[in-house]
Each structure stands twice: as C-alpha cells, then as structure tokens.
C-alpha cells in the first residue's frame, strides 16, 4: 500500500465525515493549494472536533491523559485495509505522539480549577490589602485633605464676605456720587433756565426800546418832513410872487421901450 493511500485511510478514519472527496485515493480537495498532500479544510475540521471533545470531556487533567478515539479500533481498521500489525501500531503510536504534542501545546495556556481558585484567592487577598490601604489613607491623608479643604472653604467664605462688603460699599459710594451729580446737574439746569429767562426778558426789553426809538424817530421824521413841505410851499409861493413881479416889470419896461420907439 502506498503512502498516499495510507494518508487517505487515516484522514477518513479520523474525520468520519463521509466527504465525497475521500471516495477515491488521490482525488484531493479542490479548495487546497496541495491537493494530493493535505487538505487544510479537513484539518481544521479535525482540529475543531478535537477541541470540542477536549472541552466537553475534560480529557487533559492533572490526574492522567485520555484520548478521544479508540486506538485498538484504529489498528483494526488499518489491518483491515492491508496494513500489518506492526505498521498499524507504528501509525497509531505516531498519532498518539502527535496528539500528545498538540494537547501539551493547547494546555500550556490553560489552568486547572485548583489553580484558578488559588489565583482567585490571591486576587481577593490583594483586593483586601488594597481596601485596608485605602482605609488607612482615608484616615490619615484624606483627613488631612478634608481639614485643608475645610480651611480653604472658610477662607473662601471670608473672602466672599469681604468681597460682598466691598461691593456694597462701592455701590453705596456710587449711588451717593450719582445723587450728588444728579442734584448738581439739576441746579445747573435751574441756573441755566433762570439765565435764559433773564436773557429773554432783556431781549424783550431791548425790542421794546428799539420799537419806542423807531416810533419816536418816525414821528420826528414825519414832523420834519411836514415842516420841509410847508417851507417848500411857502418858498413856492414866494418864488411865484417874485416871478410874477419880475414878469410884470419886464412887460412894463418893454411897453415903455415900445412907446418910446413909436
């Protein structure tokens, strides 16, 4: 029997899946990179089956090692497929060694229940010691911090009170200054109103004086104009008289020359 047929029989015996890929020796798996050597898909199936059986039955313990398949049945299967008894025992011993190595690798990262309980007790003791340390710190340092915080709170309250007092004083002084400025502004406004009233009265008096002066000036002008007009009329009459006398005189002289001439 060839090595390929031997590998096929081993894979078929260990898987027990009845996959059609194992129906013929050398058929291989079409999803593998090495179709005639190893099927990684079926290897993963075998590994998951091994892990499941290991977790379910708790095979690997501190008492002893147990295997999840019957070595005698595998030997009989190999002998039924043409292997000799010596070859079958060698193959089964190789499988046992491989399983032991795999189990050791798997159980390196695992712990027993007793170890888990010991670790839990250690963790609980550490937690208890931490609690004790926290209680000690709370009694010593935390009390000091609490007293310091109380002092700071008292100082802050005093500062707050001083600040409120200063704010009240500033508000009172500002209010007093505001009232003084308000009264001063009112007085200034009253003074300005009084001055404005006096100015208005003086302006009214000036206007009245100007009106009186204008009326008097108009009257004087009217009297002067009437006097000038009367003088002009009198001068007119005098001029007319002089002209009439001079005209009559000239006529008289002219008549006298005319008579003398004739």
Swiss-Prot record:
Organism lineage reads as:
Eukaryota, Metazoa, Chordata, Craniata, Vertebrata
Cross-referenced InterPro entries, in alphabetical order?
CCDC90-like (IPR024461)
Q: Which Pfam families match?
A: CCDC90-like
Q: Which family is it part of?
A: Belongs to the CCDC90 family.
| Cellular compartments per GO CC | mitochondrial inner membrane
Q: What function does this protein fulfil?
A: Key regulator of mitochondrial calcium uniporter (mcu) required for calcium entry into mitochondrion.
Which parts of the chain are coiled coil? 138-175
Which GO biological process annotations does it have? calcium import into the mitochondrion; calcium ion import; mitochondrial calcium ion transmembrane transport; positive regulation of mitochondrial calcium ion concentration
Which organism encodes this protein? Answer: Xenopus tropicalis (Western clawed frog)
- Topology in the membrane? Single-pass membrane protein
Question: Which parts of the chain span the membrane according to its record?
Answer: 239-261
What UniProt keywords apply to this chain's record, in alphabetical order?
Answer: Calcium, Calcium transport, Coiled coil, Ion transport, Membrane, Mitochondrion, Mitochondrion inner membrane, Transmembrane, Transmembrane helix, Transport
Looking up PANTHER family in the UniProt record yields: MITOCHONDRIAL CALCIUM UNIPORTER REGULATOR 1, PROTEIN FMP32, MITOCHONDRIAL
Q: Which gene encodes it?
A: mcur1
* Location in or out of the cell: Mitochondrion inner membrane
Q: Does the keyword Calcium apply?
A: yes
Tell me what this protein is called.
Mitochondrial calcium uniporter regulator 1
């Amino acid at each position: 029997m060839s090595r390929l047929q031997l590998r096929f029989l081993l894979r078929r015996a260990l898987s027990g899946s009845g996959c059609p890929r194992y129906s013929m020796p050398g058929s291989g798996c079409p999803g593998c990179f090495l179709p005639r050597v190893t099927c990684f898909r079926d290897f993963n199936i075998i590994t998951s089956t091994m892990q499941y059986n290991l977790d379910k039955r708790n095979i690997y313990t501190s008492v002893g090692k147990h295997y999840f398949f019957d070595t005698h049945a595998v030997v009989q299967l190999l002998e039924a497929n043409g292997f000799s008894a010596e070859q079958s025992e060698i193959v089964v011993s190789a499988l046992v060694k491989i399983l032991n190595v795999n189990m050791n690798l798997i159980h390196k990262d695992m712990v027993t229940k007793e170890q888990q309980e010991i670790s839990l007790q250690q963790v609980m003791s550490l937690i208890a010691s931490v609690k004790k340390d926290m209680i000690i710190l709370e009694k010593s340092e935390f009390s000091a911090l609490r007293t310091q915080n109380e002092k700071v709170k008292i100082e802050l309250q005093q500062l707050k009170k001083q600040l409120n007092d200063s704010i009240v004083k500033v508000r009172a002084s500002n209010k007093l200054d505001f009232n003084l400025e308000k009264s001063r502004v009112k007085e200034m406004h009253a003074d300005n109103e009084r001055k404005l009233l006096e100015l208005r009265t003086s302006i009214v008096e000036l206007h009245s004086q100007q009106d009186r002066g204008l009326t008097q000036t108009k009257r004087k002008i009217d009297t002067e104009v009437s006097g000038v007009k009367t003088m002009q009329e009198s001068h007119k009459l005098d001029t007319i008289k002089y002209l009439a006398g001079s005209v009559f005189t000239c006529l008289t002289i002219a008549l006298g020359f005319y008579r003398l001439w004739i």
